[in-house]
Amino acid sequence: MKIGNIELPKTAALAPLAGVADRAMREISREYGACWTVGEMTSSKGLSFGSKKSAELLQIGEAERPTAVQLFGSEPETMAQAAEMAMEYAPEAIDINFGCPVPKVAGNGGGSALMKDPELAGRIVEAVVKAVKLPVTVKFRAGWDSEHINAVEFAKICEDAGAAALTVHGRTRMQMFAPPVDLEIIRLVKEAVSIPVIGNGDVDSPEAAKRMYDETGCDLVMVGRAAMGNPWLFRRIERYMQTGELLPEPTPEERMTVLKRHVELLCKYKGEYVGMREARKHSSWYIKGMHGAAEFRRECGEITAPEDLERLIDRVLLSCSE
């Protein structure tokens, strides 16, 4: 598939996970096979008001490319202004968030709340498309709730407004992340539009990725929560789609080696103080499912320095060897 002039293989992309898909996560994901990444959602109002925190979310390193920055908001002019400001960071595309279900975003008219106002969503897409000379992509859900499944109508409006590609999460806003993803709604969107469609939701294994490809006809799949502490999933999906081979899960040693590198990148980009505190959640994700993981989870929450991480890694590996 192509987003603008960018050709992407039929493998998997990293979703714009808030609080997770930062520079370190995007770089690690690219190293392990993600063909495309989308950064954390960034407030259009925050950018327009000069928020340093919002601007920091847009920073991109060469090792992460190709990548898109993601913006959210409910005002066409503000979204267009934010998109123009994002051009400074030279992303390959601008992604618009019409899918975030969390109350602090949707409750303020952003994210998935726009699914209740397709006409306004279309005006936002049109404004952003006119503001930048980059492909503009859109991420949205099946609908607001089970009584209002409007993804097909919504997709057509976004396409008519100039969107270059669409990402569909096969759940409604009210469903959040709980029930199994609805592959049928992704298939219906794919059949309704002529631009590329990316399927999202429950892609947690190579087999799940292939099933989404096969049952929806989507052009690409996007991995979200399943990539946390598990960047190997991208490589495993890539190999499975290309050859049918199911690569083994990483060894404990491989997991800990990549955890250490991930934390080093966090410290490089955010400084040691912030990086080591963010290492807490990443450590708990990397050790998930390993021998003694429940016992070590408390230690993950106490990490404040590199030596704390080293001790944790040593203890985890010792536990796995027993």
Model-found features: residue ranges?
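N-terminal small/glycine-rich loop or linker at the start of catalytic domains
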Residues: M1-A12, K45-P66, C100, K104-N108, ...
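Glycine-rich, positively charged N-terminal anion/phosphate-binding segment
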Residues: K2, L17-E92
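Alpha/beta catalytic cores of nucleotide-metabolism and tRNA/nucleoside-modifying enzymes
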Residues: G4, L8, A12, A18, ...
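Hydrophobic faces of well-ordered beta-strands that scaffold small-molecule active sites
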Residues: A12-A15, T37-G39, T67-L71, I94, ...
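Active-site beta-loop-alpha junctions enriched in small/polar residues
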Residues: L17-G19, T42-S44, F72-S74, G99-P101, ...
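Alpha/beta enzyme core
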Residues: A80-G110, P118-I195, E215
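Aromatic- and acidic-residue-enriched carbohydrate-binding clefts of CAZyme catalytic domains
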Residues: M115
